[in-house]
């Protein structure tokens, strides 16, 4: 069970060198977008996926215990966004928020990748900005010919 990177955008003067290639596959259990996708699956789908997954360690910080992943998914469901810090690559982390269709079904995620230090120190601001971007994209695909609607 993997997640694929479709597009990446890097500021021209970015001091960070981590740039995943488009179409890079990442394991669901170790990426913010992957965990967000799991959180939006039905309970039956979640159970099947988690119980049948080999939670392989990519770094010393990767979640490798199913109970720990379940707890993480519950927290993501509660807060509405996902964060991973150093689970794919030490020193690099990501924040992901959902993009929904008109019926409220998760269709995609949008994520921000940066140094774990930068993400930790700016988490609340970055989550808020990413959520605004996710809401705008959701509104554009759900209501393409209308003005923006605020999530409730």
PLM features: residue spans?
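Sparse recognition of residues in long alpha-helices and their boundaries
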Residues: 22, 119-120, 146
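Short loop->beta-strand "edge-of-pocket" segments that line small-molecule binding or catalytic clefts
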Residues: 38, 57-58
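Extended hydrophobic
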Residues: 64-136, 151-152
